[in-house]
């Protein structure tokens, strides 16, 4: 069974729209009279009962010819109509005129092509007025809307067209998806290996060797890809390090002196606090012993 092509469907839609418009126009005419009943029987109309009057054919109008003059002036006939004067151009002017008309200008178009400007308003395939109430149903409107698209917009508005998504992105999600796909392939191979072990010995060994080889190749590809990405990241890190430096901060001489002073004060403060803590601990121990003795 062969289905109609797109152009055939458009042609049929155009023809149906034209027939519908013609039928609507015929219904609007006041002179439209029914010559048949709903069942299909013939109905006698007034125009059929009355005899049409005979109309005589129109006669050709007689043209009166002007009387010829009996005498002539200087041996020649008098001319009633003046001849149109024809301008005779020189051959040089003719060449210049043709060059101007044929040779293209700076934009690459001849004057004749400039006169013929292409019409920017592209006509729709089917024209209809949706504002008229009761003329079209919703289904007819949808069909006419689909058929009335411009030819240039058919590719964008067609329901059958679709855009293939570009999967060549270098994002982390795309890499993870590719790794997941390869791992799912490996799992599928392992399952087929388990199923193949139930067969004959020779076939089982051959299938097992082939599947193991494919599995090793896939694992090697994954490791190679991971190493390549790691090498790229390390190289990028080295490039950044050469630009920024090793990140160490060096103190000036004054900063070193201030640092020593701060360190000395912090150590001396810590030693005093430690001595105070020791004294308080000893006092607490003596109090505890005194309480036990009492």
From Swiss-Prot:
Residues 97-136, 260-294 are annotated as: Disordered. Residues 251-279 are annotated as: Binding to RNA-directed RNA polymerase L. GO terms for cellular component: host cell cytoplasm; virion component. Residues 123-128 are annotated as: Binding to host phosphatase PP1. Keywords: Host cytoplasm, Phosphoprotein, Viral RNA replication, Virion. It comes from Human metapneumovirus (strain CAN97-83) (HMPV). Residues 169-194 are annotated as: Oligomerization and binding to RNA-directed RNA polymerase L. Residues 12-28 are annotated as: Binding to monomeric RNA-free nucleoprotein. This is Phosphoprotein. The modification Phosphoserine is found at residues 106, 148, 157-158, 168, 171. Residues 264-277, 284-294 have a biased composition (Acidic residues). It comes from the Viruses.
